[in-house]
């Protein structure tokens, strides 16, 4: 079995604008335009040389219903506000949604603790917020402001932690739906004639069927992306796409906020002791969203097949060796059994292949990557863009499988992991960090 694992670097290698900052830049332009009456009165945009402006022009003046939906999703969206004012985005045009969301959620979670270590209930009034953005946004609801109002005989306003949590969650779902519109109505309609040699070699192979005739066998694909890039460039239209597992969901234009199944969340940050007890913010976590949104998990079946095959191999090997050790018949038969056992001892199990392309091996996907890589009958090839990217992938892999396991699997007779440079490198040097994001 061949399994191809793809992250956002796969889409970037096909010159598609799928970085978070690409999307955020689009939203920023969209908001600026719809909030400028003079432009709307013109009936068209004057400058549409950049494809993103060409799309915005088409969206505003030709797709009014979709435009209205997008406006409702991004206008006054607390996450859009937070990302746009983020210093990293403002100074370097770079942002990691998942990391930033995690910072906000963890700060709010921590704010619920009293000085004595006890945690307040979600239904209780918010006292203070440590995140600078949230503190500024909800400053009039803090305990200090309520006290100040009371001193002037005013009535201080209050808000509960639950109300803040729910606003963050609802606006996250709106953000995800807005991203879905961007990907399906813009990115997936972008012309893309770039096909990667490395992927072409992996996608399909000629095998003999039960009737002896040659057939084309397509590899399994585990996609961490929301887009259909792999399907439209590497699969024939008549091919059934049941070999693709969209682990983080798949973008579809005519979805809604309610039935969208795209996963955009955070990794577990609580200790083992706390994570099963404190579930106030569980809806923001990736594992929860995968279950709740019923995204793909076909890879589980692939892993099970791989492990069952290895178990069967070991059992058969043990059976042959035990038979040789226990045989008490004539010398010729005993010799034959021992020769067979000797041959079996050195025999290797049939290997399956996992190819990882455009994925940073970030620890947020640790559980999935471990299931694929940590099998004795799996050979993993990790593609890298340059030596800097390779170095980062090695560092991330240590966090996923551990230093000792990585050393064992990258050298000697037990080698099952190798790093391989990509054959296709149209990305410019300054884009390599963005290539890492999955």
Task: Annotate each predicted stretch with a short phrase.
Residues 1-34:
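An N-terminal structural lobe/cap that precedes and organizes the functional/catalytic core
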Residues 425-434:
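Conserved small/polar residues in nucleotide/adenosyl-binding loops
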């Amino acid at each position: 079995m061949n399994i191809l694992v793809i992250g956002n670097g796969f889409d970037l290698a096909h010159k598609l604008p799928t970085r978070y900052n690409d999307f955020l830049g689009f939203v920023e332009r969209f908001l600026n335009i719809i909030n400028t009456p003079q432009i709307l009165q013109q009936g068209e945009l004057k400058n549409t040389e950049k494809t993103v402006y060409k799309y915005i022009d088409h969206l505003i003046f030709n797709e009014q219903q979709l435009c209205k939906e997008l406006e409702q999703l991004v206008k006054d969206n607390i996450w859009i506000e937070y990302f746009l004012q983020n210093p990293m985005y403002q100074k370097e045009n770079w942002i990691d949604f998942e990391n930033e969301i995690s910072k906000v959620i963890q700060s709010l979670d921590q704010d619920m603790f009293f000085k004595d270590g006890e945690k307040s209930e979600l239904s209780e009034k918010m006292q203070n917020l440590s995140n600078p953005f949230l503190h500024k946004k909800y400053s009039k609801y803090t305990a200090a402001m309520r006290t100040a109002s009371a001193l002037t005989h005013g009535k201080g306003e209050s808000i509960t932690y639950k109300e803040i949590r729910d606003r963050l969650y609802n606006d996250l779902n709106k953000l995800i739906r807005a991203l879905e519109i961007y990907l399906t109505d813009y990115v997936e309609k972008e012309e893309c004639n770039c096909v990667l040699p490395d992927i072409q070699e992996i996608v399909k192979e000629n095998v003999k069927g039960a009737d002896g005739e040659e057939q084309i066998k397509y590899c399994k694909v585990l996609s961490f992306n929301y887009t259909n890039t792999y399907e439209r460039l590497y699969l024939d239209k008549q091919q059934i796409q049941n070999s693709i597992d969209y682990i983080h969901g798949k973008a579809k234009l005519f979805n809604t906020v309610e039935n969208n199944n795209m996963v955009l969340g955070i990794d577990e940050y609580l200790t083992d002791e706390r994570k099963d007890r404190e579930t106030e913010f569980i809806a923001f976590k990736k594992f929860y969203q995968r279950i709740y949104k019923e995204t793909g998990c076909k890879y589980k079946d692939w892993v099970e097949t791989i492990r069952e095959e290895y178990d069967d191999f070991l059992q058969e090997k043990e059976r042959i060796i035990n038979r040789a050790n226990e045989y008490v018949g004539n010398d010729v038969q005993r010799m034959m059994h021992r020769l067979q056992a000797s041959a079996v001892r050195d025999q290797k199990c049939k290997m399956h292949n996992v190819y990882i392309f455009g994925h940073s091996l970030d620890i947020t996907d640790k559980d999935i990557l471990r299931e694929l890589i940590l099998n004795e009958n799996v050979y993993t090839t990790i593609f890298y863009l340059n030596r800097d990217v390779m170095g980062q992938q090695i560092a991330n892999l240590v966090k996923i499988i551990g230093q000792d396991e990585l050393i064992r699997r990258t050298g000697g007779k037990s080698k099952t992991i190798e790093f391989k440079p990509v054959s296709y490198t149209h990305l410019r040097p300054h884009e390599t960090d963005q290539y890492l994001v999955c």
